[in-house]
């Protein structure tokens, strides 16, 4: 709680007034924003749904980690629960605008992100593409995951999290922190502002080896911007 209070005090010094949105029921997630017309949706231990200006659905997530055992299937089930909750809000508000953002704790190519039963977040999607696909007679809405564009070593950093384990399968760099958006949000996204943050006003966020500095955070933060 001390860290949250310190962050809150630092945010108060920003030029823009930021409000701590209501995430009661989701102690793992805290959200600040400059929008006042914000109504909380479903609050769960692992996600917080917020309705902004009665037309934008934003869901902050902090999903199951693999540090204490693999939880691939559990994350798929949680992603399915999140999308089910969002679907009902979309129907009620008659909107298609959705942003899912946060620590998904798996990379874009893994089950919860790509599975049609999960986020169904594809690496390529255009505004004119068909917005869904049918699997065994059931229709699944497509989402878009722009984080694929930041993956790999063409530009530092290669991901948001670094971990080496004695396993045959270990990419070392992982893109655990992501933003996933609905098809309707694609033209509103400012592509140049999708970034992995490695520096802040107080200095760099990485070690001498250029890995995330766990004394600050074991994950690099991300940022994105939308014209709304």
PLM regions and their residue ranges:
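Structured beta-strand-rich core segments of catalytic domains in phosphoester-bond hydrolases
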Residues: 1-66
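Extracytoplasmic/secreted cell-surface and envelope-processing proteins
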Residues: 7, 67-70, 108-111
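Glycine-rich, phosphate-binding/catalytic loops in enzymes
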Residues: 10-13, 76-77, 116-120
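Loop/turn elements at helix/coil->beta-strand transitions in domains of secreted/extracellular proteins
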Residues: 54-56, 94-97
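Catalytic metal-binding/acid-base residues of hydrolase active sites
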Residues: 62-64, 104-107
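A long, amphipathic alpha-helix that forms part
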Residues: 69-94
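Metal-dependent phosphoester-hydrolase catalytic domains
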Residues: 91-93, 106-228
